[in-house]
Amino acid sequence: MKLLKGMMSALAVTAGFVMPSYADEPKDQVKVGFIYVGPTGDHGWTYRHDIGRQQVEEKYGDRVETVLESVPEGPDSERVMTDMALKGADLIFTTSFGYMDPTINVAAKFPNVKFEHATGYKQAENVSVYSARFYEGRAVQGHIAGHMTKSNIVGYIGSFPIPEVIRGINSAYIHAKDVNPDVQFKIIWAYTWFDPTKEADAA
């Protein structure tokens, strides 16, 4: 729900820039791009983003057109963002941390396109960032793990050692420690956002 509200807010701001201000003129359609790091069927991060995209379509109807692309983090993502901007996107959601620098680079070339980047820390005149309070869920998980562990050792598989993920680890550890002062966390870095096989091997 928070993700959807963020999308709605961004769309409202974008609409203010691209839609005519005169009531007797027809309103233009806002074109919104979504760039995903994983498949929409992952039942996780990308899946929830795509549910938000679909709800935006339902709410705004023919006032909005959405397009989507799935591309790994890295140089090719910049090409995909550029292509979206060239094809008329007014607002582009770049939905993974590793898209940060490509987002900044492409935004500099397309000052009239608005960008929303997930979980990053770099901004520009036309680049904003968004995130969620993931640490709240990690706090609950840590509390449960602290109660349940019989060895006092809790394994934690982290995606990447970046602020967003580390904040979640800290939250889990603090709340596990609160109920079990002897608890220890063992962190394993997967260095991927979506690789079920690798994540299972790490576990």
What are these regions (language model features)?
Residues 53, 140-187:
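An alpha-beta-alpha
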Residues 64-85, 191-203:
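Structural motif
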Residues 108-132:
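Flexible loop/hinge segments that line or gate small-molecule binding clefts
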